[in-house]
Amino acid sequence: MYQPHFWQRSIGWLCGGLLILLLGWTIAPATALAAAGVDNYVIQYLKVTDTVELPVNDRGETKTFTAVDLTRGKRLFEENCKNCHVGGSTLPNPLVSLSLKDLKGATPPRDTIASLVAFQRSPKSYDGSEESYSCRRVSEDWLTTEQLETLAAFILRAAAVAPGWGVESFPDSAP
């Protein structure tokens, strides 16, 4: 009967151990993020597992947001904005989405944390000429400034990197 040499058994154990270590090393970060309450969308589509810097204003100042912050922002978006802004589109006005291009093109631009918070506190039409009645005014009693900043961070990150966010047209899904 064939008996493997000691070194052959050792290599087998070493390979098995390395495989287990490698699997643990690749699975552990995702498991840790999930345990911290990070939404998989934030990891997979917003590509944030740690922190991200986002523009606070047009003077180049930035603020750091964590994956947990963006998860909270996503939750706020789902609870308060998703009915009109599915996937970054704008159902009441499909010509103006939450794409980065459209956010930058608004008057005034809405492509920073501060400008999005200001818009949500006092919504204006896309050209800035009049009050917007299609977007609800968000009072301090409804969402705090910190919550609005977190919501704005989610929108800006999605607009920058999420596939399909704010696309201009949807494929016809009818058979």
From Swiss-Prot:
Cofactor(s) named in the record: heme c
Induction: Present at very low levels (at protein level).
Keywords: Electron transport, Heme, Iron, Membrane, Metal-binding, Photosynthesis, Photosystem II, Signal, Thylakoid, Transport
Note on how the cofactor is bound: Binds 1 heme c group covalently per monomer.
Localization per Swiss-Prot or TrEMBL: Cellular thylakoid membrane
GO molecular function: electron transfer activity; heme binding; iron ion binding
Topology in membrane: Peripheral membrane protein
Record-level GO cellular component terms: photosystem II; plasma membrane-derived thylakoid membrane
UniProt-listed SUPFAM superfamilies: Cytochrome c
Residues reported in the UniProt entry to bind heme c: 81, 84-85, 135
One GO BP annotation of this record: respiratory electron transport chain
Segment forming the signal sequence: 1-34
Annotated function: Probable low-potential cytochrome c, can partially replace cytochrome c-550 (PsbV) function.
Family that this chain belongs to: Belongs to the cytochrome c family. PsbV subfamily.
NCBIfam families hit by this protein: PS_II_psbV2 (TIGR03046)
Name of protein: Cytochrome c-550-like protein
